[in-house]
Amino acid sequence: MARTVNCVYLNKEADGLDFQLYPGDLGKRIFDNISKEAWGLWQKKQTMLINEKKLNMMNVDDRKFLEEQMTSFLFEGKEVEIEGFVPEKDQD
């Protein structure tokens, strides 16, 4: 049976992550409150941020910036702003 969480991002019950993917207290908070679906959405945004802003994950400042963006996206509902990115329109 899949583990479910009350996902803060999606605002609904959904399948939870299989294990803690991020270290520390923030990782525990993500594990307890974020669904697989929401984490997948974040991973897409994270990849775009890393590529567009040319972030270096060996750089402490870049990692801190990415963590701030992740917290804002997952827990505060703030959209990640990526310069020049225009989301595709839904086609009926």
Swiss-Prot record:
Could be a mediator in iron transactions between iron acquisition and iron-requiring processes, such as synthesis and/or repair of Fe-S clusters in biosynthetic enzymes. One of its GO terms (biological process) is cellular response to oxidative stress. The keyword Iron applies. It comes from Shewanella baltica (strain OS155 / ATCC BAA-1091). Pfam families: Iron_traffic. Keywords: Iron. InterPro entries: Fe_traffick_prot_YggX, Fe_traffick_prot_YggX_sf. One of its GO terms (molecular function) is iron ion binding. This is Probable Fe(2+)-trafficking protein. PANTHER family: FE(2+)-TRAFFICKING PROTEIN-RELATED. Belongs to the Fe(2+)-trafficking protein family. Disulfide bonds: none annotated. One of its GO terms (cellular component) is cytosol.
